[in-house]
Amino acid sequence: KSMNPDGTVILNGDDDKLITISEVYGKKPVFFGIKNTAGIYADHIENLGLEGVRCRIHMAADNAVQTENQTENAAEDFTVQIPVAGEHMVYNAMAAAAVGEALGLTAEQIKTGIEGMETIARRNHIIRENGFLILDDCYNANPVSMKASVDVLDTAKGRKVCILGDMFELGENEKQLHYEVGSYLAQKQMDVLLTVGALST
């Protein structure tokens, strides 16, 4: 509702609810996804552990955004190495690619932008100091992001110490959602688990 009528709608095509949206302000949305290969999609996904993720992003020509800035090269495919750990980062890369395409960037420019991405504190941020590696991802966690962080930590080598706190603003299902994260974590190979907070203990 807040979008400029001349703007571009970019949606996750793997979301069952969003994929049903066929038109916004008379325009077809730009979809990206892994399971649903309509529009912009990624395949050949290779998890590189804490070094990031490599994948191939396909910029489908029939899903190209028609703007004054649109370039002839926007529909190219390219292989990119995302320098942030976690396979979930592929979705962020595809969303960024869709935005870049809408702004008229070439595939090479989009690739360069993704490969130059840097994390910020408390957002999937890796700190290396005194022989220790810390995965700092503690800002405003939710069940999906918590499981993604656990997956990233699970790929690390050496002794793994997992420190988790409560997740807030989850509503009436907060206890069940904490239990689900705990059950998910139990399937991973952690050496030490420390929990902080009334809902996490």
What does each model-identified segment do?
Residues 120-122, 138, 142-201:
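Active-site beta-alpha connecting loops in nucleotide-dependent enzymes
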Residues 1-134, 158, 183-186, 190-192, ...:
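Acidic, Mg2+-coordinating active-site environments of NTP-dependent enzymes
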